[in-house]
Amino acid sequence: MKKAVQAKFIKTAILNKDYPIIRSPSGDILPEVAVVGRSNVGKSSLLNHLFEAKHLVKTSATPGKTQALNFFSLNDQIAFADLPGYGYAKVPPSVRKEWGPMVRSYLESRESLKLILFLLDIRRIPNEEDIQFLEWVLYHEKALILVLTKIDKVNQKELRLNTTKILDTLSLMNLHHLYYSVPKNRGRKELMIMIQDALNDEDKQE
């Protein structure tokens, strides 16, 4: 019998001092996975699919409007931080400016952060914001998995061509990546394995 998935919403926070310390029942601090991507890339849908919950992660009616981090736990084993989406054109400039310092503060100071899931829409070539973020992650030597979302929107030829274009644009042909589609129910098992493997590798390095 398949073991039931237990996902829980923990907290919404804006300031570093308000970020929760998420622990296992035995008191150990859980390794944390940050989920990052442009607005409309499908972060909420992917997390709900990953958690096997329809509405645990709320989808904003106005993408990019709320500049806050949402924290979750999965099976009391892994913590997840859903970072606000970036790049939404209709967001006021003042709100857009908040994204950089907030996310940078989280990524630089969060000791429990062990892995970043970087989501990109398979139909979109990475722009300057995407490349800058990836360069920052690599500079700080953070573990990262590239998740190419919305693959149900392209055919097999487009999938191959777009993957090559994306990896070429990022100048990282050997970057760990996988395909994800919520409507096709594709990618969850593979992503969970990659997450666990990455967290195990982090444990060995510490």
Curated annotation (Swiss-Prot):
Known cofactor(s): Mg(2+)
Keyword check for Lipoprotein: no
GO cellular component terms attached to this protein's record: cytosol
UniProt keyword list: Cell cycle, Cell division, GTP-binding, Magnesium, Metal-binding, Nucleotide-binding, Septation
Binding site for GTP: 37-44, 64-68, 82-85, 149-152, 180-182
Transmembrane segments: none
GO molecular function: GTP binding; metal ion binding
UniProt xrefs under PROSITE patterns: G_ENGB
CDD domains registered for this protein in UniProt: YihA_EngB
Residues annotated as domain EngB-type G: 29-201
GO biological process: division septum assembly
Entry binding sites for Mg(2+): 44, 66
Family the entry assigns: Belongs to the TRAFAC class TrmE-Era-EngA-EngB-Septin-like GTPase superfamily. EngB GTPase family.
NCBIfam families tied to this protein: GTPase_YsxC
Known function: Necessary for normal cell division and for the maintenance of normal septation.
Name by which UniProt lists this protein: Probable GTP-binding protein EngB
Gene: engB
